[in-house]
Regions:
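N-terminal signal-anchor/signal peptide hydrophobic helix marking the start
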Residues: 187-191
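Polar-ligand-bearing catalytic/cofactor-coordination segments
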Residues: 1-185, 199, 203-280
């Protein structure tokens, strides 16, 4: 219970710091450049997004998990060989103590440049065979091979530009700020209007983001099978992950479209079987 409260407290702290930095930066830009604030805001928040990706694995994630280097055993050797084959430079291979709060099995590659590292959940190492772990690692390396992190940063930049442009248009409309009692976007009393705008924009963008994410995940699945040359292992992994992660095996199509960041487990298995059978 103490661990849960600790996690919640740290989450609140991170959220509060993020909110303060966002607000101070936004209003600083608006008051610094009252005519072209939207353009400067786009550039500033694009840079902050890239900075967050860089520092996330060394500043944020250690607040919630303990990380230990993967032992110098056969698995580490295979992981390093696979990364070399994939042409992906990894600064380190770490194990996260995810089991203290979840049964979810996962792995990910985080960071940029010197902060780039591969992280394996201890739940994954305990539940799966070595071949299954390698399949999951191959999937994560597939994301880096395809440059998905850079594509996501580029898409985020486009989304920020569209958002700031729309906000600049609204800011010029009479009456937009009246209900909040604000004189304009630079007025702190405009915050409720800005929060409402952010909420509505997020709802509009979410299905688009998730559709792109599902396409990226499907491509990473393809690369994982190419690297591991083991479609049967992929099927076993997807079945086990579906069970461990409590996945919905028959989600309604509208729900998948709006909320799913990954293809449903049955779709991923079907894609593997279709690929292995040579079907178009």
């Amino acid at each position: 219970m103490g661990s849960w409260f600790g996690d919640q407290g740290r989450s609140l702290l991170v959220g509060a710091v993020t909110a303060v930095v966002t607000a101070v930066t936004f209003y600083g830009v608006v008051r610094w450049q009252p005519r072209t604030w939207w353009l400067w805001g786009w550039a500033t928040f694009t840079a902050l997004t890239a900075l967050l990706v860089f520092i996330y694995p060394v500043v944020i994630t250690p607040l919630f998990n303990k990380f230990t280097p993967l032992g110098d055993d056969g698995l580490r050797t295979r992981v390093e060989q696979l990364a070399e084959t994939a042409g992906v430079d990894i600064a380190d291979v770490l194990v996260a103590d995810a089991s203290r709060r979840t049964t979810t099995e996962n792995a990910y590659v985080a960071g940029l440049g010197s902060t780039k590292r591969l992280v394996l959940y201890d739940t994954l190492l305990r539940s799966g065979s070595e071949d299954e772990t390698i399949l999951v690692v191959a999937h994560e390396l597939g994301h880096r091979m395809e440059g998905h992190i850079w594509k996501n940063l580029a898409l985020s930049s486009v989304g920020l530009l569209a958002g700031f442009g729309a906000l600049a248009f609204l800011a010029r409309q009479s009456g937009v700020w009246d209900w909040a009692g604000a004189s304009g976007i630079a007025d702190l009393r405009a915050i409720p209007v800005l929060l409402l705008f952010a909420l509505l924009a997020g709802l509009v963008v979410l299905p688009i983001e998730n559709t792109i994410s599902r396409n990226f995940e499907a491509r990473a699945d393809d690369i994982a099978i190419e690297l591991s040359d083991s479609p049967n292992t992929a099927v076993r992994v997807f079945r086990r992950l579906g069970y461990a992660n409590l996945a919905d095996l028959k989600p309604p199509a509208p729900l998948v479209w709006a909320l799913f960041t990954h293809p449903p487990i049955p779709d991923r298995i079907e894609a593997v079987l279709s690929r292995s059978s040579g079907a178009p």
